[in-house]
Each structure stands twice: as C-alpha cells, then as structure tokens.
Amino acid sequence: MVTMSSADKALKSLYLGVVTQQLNTGVNPFLAKIKQSTQDVWGKEIRRLAQYGINGGIGAGTEDGDLPSSAGNNYEQFVLSLKNLYGKIEISDKAVRASENNVGAFVNLLNAEMEGLLNASSYNFGRMLFGDGTGKLCSVVSVTDGVITVDSVKNLIEGMVVDFRASTGTAISSATARRILSVDRSAKTITVSGTALTSTEVPKDSIVTVQGSYGQEITGLKAIFSSTGTLYGLDRSTHKWLVPYMKTGVGTISETVIQTAIDYLEENAGSKVDMIVCSSGVKRAFQNHLATYKRNIDVMDLQGGYKAISYNGIPIISDRFCPEGTMYLLNSEDFTLHQLCDWQWLEGEDGKILKQNAGKPTYSATLVKYADLICAKPCGQAMLSGITEA
C-alpha cells in the first residue's frame, strides 16, 4: 500500500539524485561547464578574494646593485549574499488516496509532479543565468482592456506567477501573484489571472518579476557587463579591472569581430575564451556568414550531451534566454557557483519532506538551494551586442 511515508522515502532516495543531476547539468551547456563549490561560503554570505594585476616584485638590475623591491599580489574581496532558490510540488490528499492500492498510479503521479518541477526549475534557473539579479522579466508598454503589452516576451511563459512593480521596484499591491494565462509572442502581449488590470494600476514602464523574487535572484551575466555601478560590493569607477570588453552596434557578425574580442581578452586580461553563448538569431547569422564564404561548419560534442558549432575550436551555443542580437565570449574557468549545499529537500523537525498545507487537503514538498554566481575575472569576458540576427 502506498503511504505518505513511502512517498517521502521515494522523494529522498529515488528522485533527489536525478533532479539534482538534471538541474546542475541539464539546464544549459554554460551551467554544465562551470564549477560548483562550497568554498568561500561564510554563514549567509560568499566572501571570495579576487586577484587582479600582477605581482610587482620583479625587475632587472646591475651585477652588484639592489634587488627589486617586493610588491605582492593585488587582492580585493568580493561579497555576495547567498540567494535562496526554491521549487515546490503539491499533491492532493484525494490523489494519494485514489492511488494508495495502485503503486503504478502513484508512481505516475509523482513522476508527473517531479517532471513539472524539473521543467519549471530548469526554465527559471536558466533564465536567471542571463539576468542581473533584480529578477526583471520585462517592462510594460501599455495596458488595454486587461491585455498587457510588454517590450519582450522572451522570459515569459504560461503558468508563471508574476508581480507587477513600479519602475522604481515598488510592488503594486493590486497586481501581485498574478498567473500568466496566455502569451502572444508575435504581438508581445500577455493576459493574467484575477481582475482585469488597467493602465492606471500598471502604468507604462512598470516592470514584471517572478512572484516574490525582486532583488533576490542570482547574479547573472547581465550584472557583469556594465561600466558603471557596483559589482560584488566594489565600485567599478575605482576598480576598472571589473569592466569587461563590450562592443555595441556590431551589425553584421563576422570572424574578424569575434577574433578582435578574443585577441583583446588574451592581450589585456590573459583570458582564454572557451565558450561563446549567443541568441539563436545570432547563431543563424554566423552560420549564414560561414555559408557565404563556403566555410565548413564544425560540430562539437559538449559536456552534458550538448552539441555546438565551433569557431577555432571554441563552441558556439545558442540559448533561448540570451538577449537578442547579443553574443557573450566567456572563460568558464572564471565562473563559480558558490553554494551552501547542493539541491536538498526542505525537511521538518520530524525529518518529513511532504507536509500538509495548513487548512487544506493537500501536501507539498519544497526543493531548496542557497547559492550565487561569481566571476573571478570580469575583465576577462566580452560581450558583442547590436548584432543583426538572421
């Protein structure tokens, strides 16, 4: 007979390992390649020493002259708070009782819930890797008869629960925890649950975020590629080595544009690009460029079972969350996902995973991870934007 106790054991012993593996390597090739470590985690924070420049204790001199003065390595400390990442499943008591004498039916029930959790978590984690930590999904352009027009639907999907916020980030109390009912990708419009929103409630330039996630998401690639503001607690205006290579208004993509960025990183930061990430439109544009000049398109096998085209042995991968017209040239060895622990089930004092929801005939289980992403050498990364897509 199937019981809640046996379901608990299944979640711990059968599902956790598979889900962890999928979330660590199956989200996208970039995440599969970067390191994951519990080092440099102190309490609720990540504190990591970052070296920049070179050791100054070198020089040349006369046969009997003074030796060079010592001048050790340059260090600064990166500081980030661990972000709290959650995924939740829910099973009704009715569904459990209906399948208590049918193990196969209960397994199918759990499989369906876990597959849904895995898909949603993979989607959300993959999206965050390209964000700036604020959790902004898009901006509102207009609201007409409850239909919301936004500037981009790349980060939106049916079923997502979102909050609407003022452009300053302040929550709009009448427009929180709204579930997306439909997404029109050609018109860039969405509809949401609840009473119809108006342009007075949600004015132009309001922002959309995942429920309760504003300012709580991991520090993704967008946070790195800026020449102003702070990064990891340091001001870029006084720490110029935090500023990466950025070229805007690229237009037509070519090998020369890519090689110029790679050469800059090698000559000025000593960085070796080992992964290129771009939007699908940029990848198609590069493939068109190769075809125009009758170049062979080489295909590579990557960790995690992925395949990619290559440029001089460097894989070029497209990602659905990469901004349009953008290409990132990265040294994955500079990135580390610092974590307090790997994915775990949230357990009660009794050690149980599945817990009854207060006042409801349902049980829920929550998957958690406390982590954030740090790039040890931001100046060793590059971004090309304004690329004409195909």
Question: Locations of the language-model features?
Answer:
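Core alpha/beta structural scaffold of self-assembling particle/tube/pore-forming proteins
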Residues: 1-59, 71-390
